[in-house]
Amino acid sequence: MKSSAIRQSFLDFFASKGHTVVPSSSLVPGNDPTLLFTNAGMVQFKDVFTGQDTRPYSRAVSSQRCVRAGGKHNDLENVGYTARHHTFFEMLGNFSFGDYFKQDAIKYAWEYLTTVLKLPSEKLWVTVYAEDDEAYDIWHNDVGVPKARIVRIGDNKGARYASDNFWAMGDTGPCGPCTEIFYDHGPDVAGGPPGSPDEDGDRYIEIWNNVFMQFNRDEAGTMHPLPKPSVDTGMGLERISAVMQHVHSNYEIDLFQALIAAAARETNTHDLGNNSLKVIADHIRACSFLIVDGVIPGNEGRGYVLRRIIRRAIRHGYKLGARAAFFHRIVPDLGIAMGEAYPELVKAQTRVMDILRQEEERFFETIEHGMGILESELKKLVAGGVFDGELAFKLHDTYGFPLDLTADICREAGVAVDTAAFDAAMARQKAQARGAGKFKLGAGLDYAGEATTFHGYDTLAREASVLALYKDGSAVGELKEGDSGVVVLDHTPFYAESGGQVGDRGTLQSKQGAFEVEDTLKIQAQVFGHHGVVKTGSLAVGDSVLARVDETARARTMRNHSVTHLMHKALREVLGEHVQQKGSLVDSEKTRFDFVQPSPMTAAQIREVEARVNAEILVNTPTQARVMGIEDAQKTGAMMLFGEKYGDEVRVLDIGSSRELCGGTHVARTGDIGLFKIVSESGVAAGVRRVEAITGDNALAYLQAREQEIQQAAAALKAHPAELGAKLAQTLDHVRALEKDLERLKSKLAASAGDELVAQAADINGVKVLAARLDGIDAKGLRETADKLRDKLKSCALVLGTVADGKVSLIAAVTPDVTAKIKAGELVNVVAAQVGGKGGGKPDLAMAGGTDPGALPAALASVEAWVQSRLS
């Protein structure tokens, strides 16, 4: 039975039992900022289990894409070396939200395994929590499992309710016992039943876990029965596929065999049992689906985990002999294997391949050098030795080797890595980076007062009272003239930095003094900190102030923020729906927008985006902002940022034909933007491009400056601006013709100089020796002259030098019959050392440079004596 058929049969079975089939959620959890990746089927239902969310159904079934790599659940180092460890896997699960409980959950599991999949019942073992008599009785009395195949598992992890068969979401909250189902591979495989001393063997393999959430644990550890007990189950598709296909390793199932064959094809490997092929086959799934779900290789967070997985795959390909990008070419094979179940993979195939290829090409530039350093160091160590942590950090910092990749290679050689030294080197680098960065006061301030009420959508000036003052991070009662600090107000028109938009600046004016606001940041979610300096007088807690935003800066920022929405929509229309925002910065000067895009934008695409945005501006439609519930916002079709966590209420912004969620400040009508111009487009990471654009008076000033430059260039070329291109092409043709004439003249000059120099050559033991300075000649001319002199002098050793821009250039040439005694590299370095330089090359030709032109005459004069010493 193929993996795809098992997946579908599971969904169909539970659908027939009244379950709603719920699609797999993203690998990037949208409702849990503490979780790096979705690692279980229940993640998308977590808020339902905790009562923070409701669904229109009480029974659900899903096949959830999961990743375990990085953080608490990290299987990376075992992948490829064991039968069942993966970075990516699919979790089949059925869920009850206060509907059915143990009785039906157990019966459903048994019916699916024995009736649908037709597994022999005598091959199945079960475990229950030692105190869960209810589950035990259901298994034995209702299902009919013999007592000999039901194992009670107690608290085996050193604490009350700390057991393999007791599940908890955390130290507090929903929890409960679980029952696990095991498959017996038979006596030919080593290992004992669950709960026995030999349970870690491979004979008895867990295939399904049913968690019964029936308690809520409080901070005192007391268990309170939940009013609506729930069920959360999980069965790995790869494990049950191995059972159904009568193989012992997950890597032997149909899905993996296709990917292993593809990896072997791309690395030209004939041994299909090689562990490196298993690594590559596993990693292509994790990497491809992470990119599909919006993760881009980077240097932190999820992006760095993705980069580590990609580079681990590349390293295993390198180990198999690959010396160029190969990994991305396996993506189409993955599409064939899994595209029917996950059509989003096929839809994004080109983008996935492009991002992987770029990441591969980048790492292949450094992997050979890095591997050379690593392998050289390993040769010095014996098994059981320790690899230098400082060197591991150098491999990480200079050659892009993640620590776990270095550790992986060392592990194969029986060597450990000094991770403490690595961590210390990393900490030093981070400390230096922090020291070089700009420090901003903000979230660290200790404030426990009332919240700030924001009025900045409607007004730019507002009376307010000072609630708190801070100086050097500590609360104070007063700020005096010249003091820098932070002011907290009860009301404010100042927008605090959020959503990529910078904080407002302006003034706080009281009877006692004036405070210049340089920036506005959130100290807490609803508490605004006004950062700045007292310009005159003083400011005290309790003072009444007039808070006034800098109107010009705010207007420019609003134009730039509003146009970002229009640009985002235009980018998706011109480049494709794969465009997703990866970051933004909006201030009074520009908007900077980072987005998913595998290749640079063409000039035509940039012009098209500009045209679409400016067309929206010309229509001059009104902007509308509405506050509504998150579900209502979703129904409107408003665009939401991928992976962003939103509250129950959100602000939906309609501007032009764009509709997005946004809490920033915006223009009243699109026409207020005035003018839009993209000023730069560049790459910031593999698969991520950056556009910078300007609006309004800034855009006008930019275009006027470019126009002035064109007029000045036209005047210099004595041409009309409209004819500048043709005139420039004509001028360049003329320059190229002159350059060719110059090259011919230089060659003649070099030949003439060569003829004169032949007569200056000294004869030492039958070898012509020449050392001379040539002026007005470049490096190319120097070499041509040396070649001609060598031909004319026959048996010779010569050095020529020239000076340009305060730098010395040298060349040494030696005929083949002389290289046994005189090497050109040695000869040129004798001279170079005297002029403050060094060089190198072949035995018959070498070049060098120097920094001391004044020493050149004496250095050249020393050549004859040195040659004499080598020939005598």
UniProtKB/Swiss-Prot annotation:
Q: Does the keyword tRNA-binding apply?
A: yes
Quote the SUPFAM superfamilies the UniProt record gives: Class II aaRS and biotin synthetases, Putative anticodon-binding domain of alanyl-tRNA synthetase (AlaRS), ThrRS/AlaRS common domain, Translation proteins
- Cross-referenced InterPro entries: aa-tRNA-synth_II/BPL/LPL (IPR045864), Ala-tRNA-lgiase_IIc (IPR002318), Ala-tRNA-ligase_IIc_anticod-bd (IPR018162), Ala-tRNA-synth_IIc_core (IPR018165), Ala-tRNA-synth_IIc_N (IPR018164), Ala-tRNA_ligase (IPR050058), Ala_tRNA_ligase_euk/bac (IPR023033), DHHA1_dom (IPR003156)
Identify which cofactors the protein needs according to its UniProt entry: Zn(2+)
Which top-rank group of organisms is this from? Bacteria
Write down the chemical reaction(s) this protein catalyses: tRNA(Ala) + L-alanine + ATP = L-alanyl-tRNA(Ala) + AMP + diphosphate
Give GO BP annotations, semicolon-separated.
Answer: alanyl-tRNA aminoacylation; negative regulation of DNA-templated transcription
Report the EC number(s), separated by commas if there are several: 6.1.1.7
Keywords of this entry: Aminoacyl-tRNA synthetase, ATP-binding, Cytoplasm, Ligase, Metal-binding, Nucleotide-binding, Protein biosynthesis, RNA-binding, tRNA-binding, Zinc
Subcellular localization: Cytoplasm
Q: What Pfam families would the database entry show?
A: DHHA1, tRNA-synt_2c, tRNA_SAD
Cellular component GO terms held in the UniProt record = cytosol
Keyword GTP-binding on this protein?
Answer: no
Q: What class of enzyme is it?
A: ligase
Chain coiled-coil ranges: none
- Purpose: Catalyzes the attachment of alanine to tRNA(Ala) in a two-step reaction: alanine is first activated by ATP to form Ala-AMP and then transferred to the acceptor end of tRNA(Ala). Also edits incorrectly charged Ser-tRNA(Ala) and Gly-tRNA(Ala) via its editing domain.
Query: What the record says about its domains?
Result: Consists of three domains; the N-terminal catalytic domain, the editing domain and the C-terminal C-Ala domain. The editing domain removes incorrectly charged amino acids, while the C-Ala domain, along with tRNA(Ala), serves as a bridge to cooperatively bring together the editing and aminoacylation centers thus stimulating deacylation of misacylated tRNAs.
Q: What HAMAP family has UniProt attached to this entry?
A: Ala_tRNA_synth_B
> What name goes with this protein?
Alanine--tRNA ligase
Species of origin: Thiobacillus denitrificans (strain ATCC 25259 / T1)
Q: What is the lineage of its organism?
A: Bacteria, Pseudomonadati, Pseudomonadota, Betaproteobacteria, Nitrosomonadales
